[in-house]
């Protein structure tokens, strides 16, 4: 028996660009004071996605939006089950008190990473508001958390994975589902 992987395109490069443009417009519409906005990427692709969104926001508004990184690894309640990976340095460029935080992750699955990221953020202070952006919501919630901004909802089975690929890192762009 072989481990053959099937890859399905969920968002092509063109569709991904349109989705990023839509998400950027939604952020501009929902966040009343963009100068108080802090984009916070969650490793690994959430960091890269935050950079893309920062560029998109700048091209639409002319504002340089601040961005940071939060690594929630040490705040996870499921480390024994999922294991640990190489830790990425947390970098929050400004005090978060009274800031509008936009947590950014590429694919959301059980929501445990998001809960851990929120716990990690609160160790830095109390923001005015925390919002969540995910490129893909797979379902399978274990916690009652919803994204404020979502690129696409893709119900999956547990033997499937979804990957965001970006040109500057992967030499291809899109969102892909892989079945094992």
Regions found by a protein language model. Give the residues of each.
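PRPP-associated nucleotide enzymes
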Residues: 1-180
